[in-house]
Amino acid sequence: MEAVLRQETGYPFEETVTVTVDFAHKRVRKASFPLYFRVPQWCSQAQVLVNGEAVEAPADNRVLRLEREWSRGDQVTLRFPMEVRSSRWYGGSAVIERGPLVYALKMEEKWEKKAFEPERQDQYGPYYHTVTTDDPWNYAFRLKDIGKENLASGFKVEVKEIGDAYPWNLENAPVSIKAKAVVLRNWEEYNGSTGPVAYYNEVGGDTGDEVWIELVPYGCTTLRITEFPVRR
């Protein structure tokens, strides 16, 4: 007996994974065997349905085991609720995550094609691209806004249909997160990149206006701010 499992999902952007059971041989209608599904470490409460009915699926080392007699066309629906969360990194900086993805500041990108010097083309090819932006990027999060109790209300998640377009770019990013931030007045460009900054400052006297910023999945960006300074 050879089972065939067809998976349909918008993961890692969407929460739901649907698996349909089939059999390679047309004469096989039913068979008993276990199915195993790994629950991601970030998911605190996975939900499982078989043919639309909720089932208890004991977790053993973050693995769900479903053993039963399966019929052709049975469907297992897994839902991994994706909550916005923050983690702390270098120097006390804050990183925003949702589900398995890390998020970065969305900035409009200006791509410019440039030619290498003739003597370098054998090694590097004929040309390269520079990517720049005119958008502001010097933002920080308020400490209170990235507290666990405020993440759900302060970070607005927008999910759009994935469709057939390639999702890993700014134009087609299926998920975005709107968040409140403050301008960090003394964080400036240095040598074509972000200048040095104190990632964590309890005083916070270097902040300016409060604004709304947009975050998109890290993999959709070329230019990115991912580790944000934190101010009280």
Language-model segments: residues:
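Solvent-exposed beta-strand/loop surfaces of large extracellular or lumenal domains
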Residues: C43-R68, S86-G91
